[in-house]
Structure formats: structure tokens, C-alpha cells
């Protein structure tokens, strides 16, 4: 079939398998052209491995450090008449390129929050890898079925303590509009912490540790975003921020557990990028469009692969890691440069419907968004007939 982008709100409901493969190849080429990660990991588990930062971590480990990788994700395969999810195609492409290099790469499809998927993962590590020396936690999900209670909990994107009104960009209509959000209830805050906080990360590490599949010296990291003042009301000081603060609490006991075997646990702070998760946050498209313009002008613009490759090379496995006073690894320092933030803030209220394209890099934002789904990739013929039914050989599918 010939597949074209069809966007509804903050999701593109079509995906392009050849485009997704080309996008993965571009990221692999970036890593291989920037040289190996010294003393990097060799057997890696990535939880949330199919898109965005998790995929970038899997690529960086495999192609920057020669690592065998096991990826966990929740994606949908394509059929003869309907495309699958971008994450499915990304993972199929990743495994294909890893196999060409003779690297072990296997994937588990299912609900990473569940005990079942944790057990299947442990069994697979024991059978195929023995032990893992890096666990990357990169889940972004709107809801979670708690494995102990069976309750399905939802996360909420709201401010805490007060209603907030802010400027946003309606990406469908391409207009600036005011967005007002009422404060989250305590129940909504608790739900967001349960879905996006550190409990599941801790459950994963506890399960892996009890099963004896963490190597001596094993490290783990979970990805987070802090942002600057302009996004704080909705993000760091909002319900999502409460979940992110929970990561900072949970990491302490995880670190103690791993330190007993010479290992370490860190929260890693990454910059704002276009992902399926960030495009759903009301003020992020406008913020990202301004941020891209400023950072591209300064020559400091980065996407997922640049961020995560740099994180592994410089901080997780580097001699002089970028660490803040909270003990977090920081890869967002270029975004938070006062000059960059100052320019973004100065332009924030000046953007109008009329000057949107000249004042911001909304065009670049739209391109990045479509690239998530395999569109707008250089060298791909989007008028060609493609087969959406792409197999992942050896996948362990717990959803069937």
C-alpha cells in the first residue's frame, strides 16, 4: 500500500515502515560516526525501547558499545492493509541492523508494568544473556494497571495548587491560543505518581536483583525532564512534576541496592524533544518551536540520539560526568543555558498567528513530529508501494 501521513491531534494515525527504518539507520550512523563509548555496557535491558529516548539508548548501547540488547515495549504489528505502530517498525529495523553486525538483539512485546512481562524478561536474560550490566528505564504511558492490586490508574497533566492559564499552540489549526487548566485533585496527583513515578522502576530492579540477573557493577538510569521556569507551572510544579520528584526519592534506595554490588543508579535529565509524549503537553509545541529556533541559531540543537549517546559517553560511562547537587546526571545543560532560555522567554509573548513561522521554528517542529512516524525522512520514496506487514523474528509477544 502507499502510506501518507494522517494526523489527528497530537498523534499521526499512519506510520511508514521504510521511513521508520531509515530513521533508525540515521541514528545508527550518528553513533558509529562519533566513535565508541569507552568502557561502555555490554549486556543491556531497555524498558521502553521502541521510540524516543529509549530507542536512542538501545541504539547507543548496541552501536556505540557493542552491546547485546533486550528491549521491552508495548507496540502493535502491521497487517496487509493497516500499518503497525512506529515503535514496531523501529524495533524491526533495529534488530535487522543489529543482526547484520552479529549482535544479539531480542524484544519482548507486552505491558512492562505487569509481573508477567518482568518474569518473561528475567527468564530471557537467564537463557540468553546470563546477566545485564545496564538497565535503562524509559517508559511513558498514560495509564498503568497495578500488578499487585489490579487497579488501572491514569496519569493527569494538570497544575498543582492553583489554576494556570498559559499560551499554547494548537498544532492542528496552527493558531496560538490561551489554555486554562484547573488544579489536579489529590487523587489525580497520586494517580500520576503511580503511573509515572519511580515505583515500577523500583519493582523492575527488585525483581531483577532477586532473580540474580544483575551483574556486579550494574548501573540503571531512568530518564526525566526538568525544564526551566517557563514550563514549570504545568510540568515540574504540576502533577507530572510530582511523579518526577518521586523518581528522585526512589532512586536513593535503588542506588543503595546496586551499590552493594559496586553498581549505581541515577536519574538522567534530558532536554525537551518532540516525542509522542511531549506533543500531548499543551505548552510544549510552542516552547519546542521557539527552543529549536534559538538552539539551531546557536548550533546547539540536539535530538534524542545526540542526547543519549552523549549521556552514555560523557556521564554514565565518562570520567567526568555532568552531575547536579541532587545527584542527577544532566544532559540538558545546553537547553538551560541562560542565553537560550532568555531568548525563548523574550519571544514567548510576541508570537502571533501571523508571525508563527518567522518567529519560531514551527516548520522544524512539524518535520520532527512527522519523522516520529517515519515521514519526512530524506531519501524515502513516499509514493512507492510498501508492505506494512513487517515481522520481528524471534520476538516474544506476551500480548497474544
Curated annotation (Swiss-Prot):
Listed HAMAP family: FabV_reductase
Annotated pathway: Lipid metabolism; fatty acid biosynthesis
Taxonomic lineage of the native organism: Bacteria, Pseudomonadati, Pseudomonadota, Betaproteobacteria, Burkholderiales
Catalytic activity, as annotated: a 2,3-saturated acyl-[ACP] + NAD(+) = a (2E)-enoyl-[ACP] + NADH + H(+)
Family note: Belongs to the TER reductase family.
Site residues (Plays an important role in discriminating NADH against NADPH), renumbered to this chain: 75
Any GO BP annotation: fatty acid biosynthetic process
Annotated EC: 1.3.1.9
Keyword Oxidoreductase in record: yes
Residues annotated as binding NAD(+): 48-53, 74-75, 111-112, 139-140, 244, 273-275
Xref: Pfam families: Eno-Rase_FAD_bd, Eno-Rase_NADH_b, Enoyl_reductase
Top enzyme category: oxidoreductase
Assembly and oligomerization: Monomer.
Protein name from the UniProt record: Enoyl-[acyl-carrier-protein] reductase [NADH]
Keyword Metal-binding in record: no
Encoding gene (name): fabV
PANTHER family: ENOYL-[ACYL-CARRIER-PROTEIN] REDUCTASE [NADH] (PTHR37480:SF1)
Residue numbers binding substrate: 225
Active site: 235 (proton donor)
One GO MF term: NAD binding
UniProt KW keywords: Fatty acid biosynthesis, Fatty acid metabolism, Lipid biosynthesis, Lipid metabolism, NAD, Oxidoreductase
Function: Involved in the final reduction of the elongation cycle of fatty acid synthesis (FAS II). Catalyzes the reduction of a carbon-carbon double bond in an enoyl moiety that is covalently linked to an acyl carrier protein (ACP).
Amino acid at each position: 500500500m502507499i502510506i501518507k501521513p494522517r494526523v489527528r491531534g497530537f498523534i499521526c494515525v499512519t506510520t511508514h515502515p521504510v521511513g521508520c527504518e531509515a530513521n533508525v539507520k540515521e541514528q545508527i550512523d550518528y553513533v558509529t560516526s562519533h566513535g565508541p563509548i569507552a568502557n561502555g555496557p555490554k549486556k543491556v535491558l531497555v524498558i521502553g525501547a521502541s521510540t524516543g529516548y529509549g530507542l536512542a539508548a538501545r541504539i547507543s548501547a548496541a552501536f556505540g558499545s557493542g552491546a547485546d540488547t533486550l528491549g521491552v515495549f508495548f507496540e502493535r504489528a502491521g497487517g496487509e492493509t493497516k500499518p503497525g505502530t512506529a515503535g514496531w517498525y523501529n524495533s524491526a529495523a533495529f534488530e535487522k541492523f543489529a543482526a547484520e553486525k552479529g549482535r544479539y538483539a531480542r524484544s519482548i512485546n507486552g505491558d512492562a508494568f505487569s509481573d508477567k512481562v518482568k518474569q518473561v524478561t528475567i527468564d530471557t536474560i537467564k537463557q540468553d544473556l546470563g546477566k545485564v550490566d545496564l538497565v535503562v528505564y524509559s517508559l511513558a504511558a498514560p495509564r498503568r494497571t497495578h500488578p499487585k492490586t489490579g487497579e488501572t490508574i491514569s496519569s493527569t497533566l494538570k497544575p498543582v495548587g492553583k489554576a494556570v492559564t498559559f499560551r499554547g499552540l494548537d498544532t492542528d489549526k496552527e493558531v496560538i491560543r490561551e489554555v486554562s487548566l484547573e488544579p489536579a485533585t489529590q487523587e489525580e496527583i497520586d494517580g500520576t505518581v503511580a503511573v509515572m513515578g519511580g515505583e515500577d522502576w523500583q519493582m523492575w530492579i527488585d525483581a531483577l536483583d532477586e532473580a540474580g540477573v544483575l551483574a556486579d557493577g550494574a548501573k540503571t538510569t531512568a530518564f526525566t525532564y526538568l525544564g526551566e521556569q517557563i514550563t514549570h507551572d504545568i510540568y515540574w510544579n504540576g502533577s507530572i512534576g510530582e511523579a518526577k520528584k518521586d523518581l528522585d526519592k526512589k532512586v536513593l534506595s535503588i542506588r543503595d541496592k546496586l551499590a552493594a554490588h559496586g553498581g549505581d543508579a541515577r536519574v538522567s535529565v534530558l532536554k525537551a524533544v518532540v516525542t509522542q509524549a511531549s506533543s500531548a503537553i499543551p505548552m510544549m509545541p510552542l516552547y519546542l518551536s521557539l527552543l529549536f529556533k534559538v538552539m539551531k541559531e546557536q548550533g546547539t540543537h540536539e535530538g534524542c540520539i545526540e542526547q543519549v549517546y552523549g549521556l552514555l559517553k560523557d556521564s554514565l560511562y565518562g570520567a567526568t560526568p555532568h552531575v547536579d547537587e541532587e545527584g542527577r546526571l544532566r544532559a540538558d545543560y545546553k537547553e538551560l543555558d541562560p542565553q537560550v532560555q532568555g531568548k525563548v522567554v523574550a519571544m514567548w509573548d510576541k508570537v502571533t498567528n501571523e508571525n508563527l513561522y518567522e518567529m519560531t521554528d514551527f516548520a522544524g517542529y512539524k518535520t520532527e513530529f512527522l519523522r516520529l512516524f517515519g515521514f519526512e525522512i530524506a531519501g524515502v520514496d513516499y509514493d512507492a508501494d510498501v508492505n506494512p506487514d513487517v515481522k520481528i523474528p524471534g520476538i516474544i509477544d506476551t500480548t497474544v
